[in-house]
């Protein structure tokens, strides 16, 4: 029995949810998202709560049960509040700036890295050493933040590079003489 899957998902105020077979659609103040559940689970909308149940007791159905419930919860929260991920840049001369819709990063390479902002994502640079990625799709926000971090991940000796704001870098000691 899935501990996460058996909890019903409350539809937040200001959000309308619609279940059409396996497709769950959510409309809210920030936009509209949908999720198509696997055939191994059944999705029902009962008095402003979405209930997800496995079709049978197979291991595959039970594995997809909790994941489907969490995906539905993520789209309901995304269209109401949205998601955001903060990144920090550490290092001498390392900085970020916006050039139109593109993010320009100076990360110690011989050239600046230009990252094209995907559709549905907003990137803000409040300070030259801080990047805020926001959007309504949790998976897409996390993916964009990971792609930006990947250009120059934090190194363990001085901590230089791009890291998540809440990330703690485990530091190493340098060589001994």
UniProtKB/Swiss-Prot annotation:
GO terms for molecular function: rRNA binding; structural constituent of ribosome. Keywords: Ribonucleoprotein, Ribosomal protein, RNA-binding, rRNA-binding. Coiled coil: none annotated. Gene3D superfamilies: Ribosomal protein L6, alpha-beta domain. The keyword rRNA-binding applies. The keyword Ribosomal protein applies. Part of the 50S ribosomal subunit. Belongs to the universal ribosomal protein uL6 family. This protein binds to the 23S rRNA, and is important in its secondary structure. It is located near the subunit interface in the base of the L7/L12 stalk, and near the tRNA binding site of the peptidyltransferase center. HAMAP family: Ribosomal_uL6_B (MF_01365_B). This is Large ribosomal subunit protein uL6.
């Amino acid at each position: 029995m899935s501990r996460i899957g058996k909890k019903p998902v409350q539809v937040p105020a200001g959000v309308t949810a619609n279940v059409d077979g396996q497709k769950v659609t959510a409309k809210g103040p920030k936009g509209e998202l949908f999720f198509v559940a696997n055939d191994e689970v059944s999705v029902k909308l009962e008095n402003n709560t979405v209930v997800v149940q496995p079709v049978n007791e197979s291991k595959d159905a039970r594995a997809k049960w909790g994941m489907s419930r969490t995906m539905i919860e993520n789209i309901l929260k995304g269209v109401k509040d949205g998601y955001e991920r903060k990144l920090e840049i550490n290092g001498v001369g390392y900085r970020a700036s916006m050039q139109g819709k593109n993010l320009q990063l100076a990360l110690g390479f011989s050239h600046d890295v230009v990252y094209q902002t995907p559709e549905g994502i907003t990137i803000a640079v409040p300070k030259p050493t801080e990047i805020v990625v926001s959007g309504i799709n949790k998976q897409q926000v996390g993916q964009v933040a990971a792609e930006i971090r990947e250009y120059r991940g934090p190194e363990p000796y001085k901590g230089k590079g791009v890291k998540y704001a809440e990330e703690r870098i485990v530091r190493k000691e340098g060589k001994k003489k």
